């Protein structure tokens, strides 16, 4: 609910600012990793207001939505092996799988001097943009790569806009960077190796492991949640099933003003109101 009412409008403001300078632009999709699925609420808002599609991202090493798969991965913070109860699955339009080898590798390129120099000198990336890449952690890189794959899959043009979020920063993964450097690049991380990573995972991002969801695929993903929430966590079948209805989610989104009122009352009673 918070992401629906706060993150969604914030992203819409970004898009409207872009559109003010490019009136012909059109918002096509919101792309974000599932995790606990809260962030996807922003996509629900953007779909309501702009008819944008919602594309979810998951680790290719644990492709729960894509292939009913399982496994371990290193894209920390995006969750795996279950469908979150608050994920509005039947409102989701696509799924993209991203390998943790891509996020691990690009984390090195984005956060080492060798990697940054390669981006600037060989690829001609604006130094100001390179400096901002430190704000992209594993899940943020996954979102970016999934957006690239989505754009290619949908054959989007220059006027068609995808929007995503940088949900974590690289400072969370300094130890992961050092561990990978020690394990795979003990002799030093070279510009050639940075180029190989960027070529394979950034410029080489393709349309593999991208699925546009039809009704059957949405129902398949929704049904996967039964085993986690009903059989294991004890959620009633009625509460599980009601989430199929768009009316349920519409009613949920209308709860924010009620919560605001209750928060105001609580703050007033405790003397912490502003």
Ranges and model annotations:
Residues 1-11, 135-142:
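A glycine-rich, Thr/Ser-enriched phosphate-binding loop motif common to dinucleotide/cofactor-binding enzymes
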Residues 11, 30-31, 54, 95, ...:
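Buried hydrophobic positions in well-ordered alpha/beta secondary-structure cores of metabolic enzymes
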Residues 13-24, 151:
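Phosphate/pyrophosphate-binding loops at sites that engage ATP/ADP/AMP, CoA/4′-phosphopantetheine
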Residues 19, 46-136, 175-274:
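Active-site/ligand-binding loops adjacent to catalytic centers
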Residues 30-44, 64-65, 138-147, 173:
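Short glycine/serine/threonine-rich phosphate/pyrophosphate-binding segments
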Residues 33, 57, 98, 165-167:
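Generic beta-strand/beta-sheet core signal
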Residues 109, 160-175:
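ATP/nucleoside-binding phosphotransfer catalytic cores, i.e., glycine-rich phosphate-binding loops
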Residues 133-153, 164-170:
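C-terminal, well-structured subdomains that either form a transmembrane helix-short loop-helix hairpin
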